[in-house]
């Protein structure tokens, strides 16, 4: 099965549409990593419609329609949520959580592009998504004839891509710093708790954090407890603004979590080329190569997403103190 990150999945799906590949497609992956969001974003980018059906919540008659007598025969009136014209994506989400009877009706849509007298219009792509058994999801086995008709893609989490998303959407830099420090907590299913960390739940947790609420209901008690301990360390960091202005050069923290917190905070809060320069020179002089690389990576991610890459490269090449990271920055920005 082809394995992709979220960003690569987006590129793959866009290419499928641009080349008009009408084969049905199945996206596998753990819950909470953004499968549905990617499909929604692709539809928006391609300027086509999206019909998102949670198959696990439908009954067989919901897809097949209602029988209506006509001249001693029964005609089936299809549901109004199925497409009749135009171009778009018919997205059958949670397909393997649906009971076999519903999967059987969905199979007709996928294999034959029709159910009864209803025909899926030519301009529509039929895509599906589902969780895997190893994710502790209540899923049914997919029949072999159905599985064999799909293009199968498996998507996984990627911290660098989540950080890029987090920076674009202004997720609190304490969350980004914490996940730099504890990357395994980006996504960790807890089968004994309804709440656990995932890209989706961190997004929700950020909203709770902004409202001065505990994030336990979003990411779970154990993860939230670690995050609170990290935030206490965050409060002990030296003031960020004087460093960015080049007016202070305090001692670099000795605590590992504080090192992650400070380097990320500098990267996130540096808004101008000069502030980035001051931040990198400070980290280089006080912390050394490892932390300069970490800070440079975060800065590069931010400036690439903000489409200011050239300014960053020019500044680093011009600064003799930072020439050692110039090649790495150019590679990161070109990725």
Name what the model sees in each region.
Residues 1-182:
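AAA+ P-loop NTPase catalytic core and its hallmark functional loops
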Residues 18, 40, 71, 94, ...:
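Glutamate identity and glutamate-enriched acidic tracts
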Residues 55-59, 82-90, 145-153, 202-221, ...:
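Short, surface-exposed, charge-dense and proline/glycine-enriched linear segments
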Residues 168-306:
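Alpha-helical lid/collar subdomain of P-loop NTPases
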């Amino acid at each position: 099965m082809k394995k992709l990150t979220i960003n690569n999945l987006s590129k793959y799906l866009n290419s499928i549409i641009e080349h008009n590949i009408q084969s049905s497609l199945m996206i596998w992956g753990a819950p909470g990593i953004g499968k549905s969001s990617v499909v929604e974003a692709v539809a928006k980018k391609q300027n086509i419609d999206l019909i998102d059906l949670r198959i696990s919540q439908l009954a067989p008659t919901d897809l097949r329609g209602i029988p209506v007598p006509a001249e001693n025969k029964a005609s089936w009136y299809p549901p109004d949520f199925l497409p009749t014209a135009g171009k778009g994506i018919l997205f059958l989400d949670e397909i393997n959580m649906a009971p076999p009877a519903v999967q059987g009706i969905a199979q007709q849509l996928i294999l034959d592009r029709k159910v009864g007298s209803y025909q899926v219009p030519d301009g529509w792509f039929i895509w599906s998504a589902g969780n895997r058994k190893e994710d502790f999801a209540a899923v049914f086995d997919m029949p072999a004839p159905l599985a064999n008709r799909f293009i199968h893609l498996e998507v996984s989490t990627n911290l660098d891509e989540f950080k890029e998303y987090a920076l674009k959407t202004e997720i609190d830099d304490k969350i980004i710093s914490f996940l730099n420090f504890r990357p395994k907590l980006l996504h960790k299913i807890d089968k004994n708790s309804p709440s656990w960390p995932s890209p989706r739940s961190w997004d929700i947790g950020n909203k709770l954090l902004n409202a001065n609420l505990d994030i336990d209901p979003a990411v779970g008690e154990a993860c939230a407890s670690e995050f609170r301990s990290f935030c206490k360390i965050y409060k002990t960091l030296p003031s960020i603004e004087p460093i960015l202005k080049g007016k202070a050069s305090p001692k670099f923290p000795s605590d590992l979590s504080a090192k992650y917190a400070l380097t990320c905070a500098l990267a996130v809060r540096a808004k101008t080329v000069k502030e980035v320069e001051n931040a990198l020179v400070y980290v280089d002089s006080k912390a050394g190569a490892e932390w300069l690389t970490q800070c440079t990576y975060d800065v590069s991610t931010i400036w690439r997403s903000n489409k200011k890459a050239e300014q960053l490269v020019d500044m680093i090449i011009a600064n003799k103190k930072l020439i050692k990271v110039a090649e790495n920055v150019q590679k990161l920005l070109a990725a």
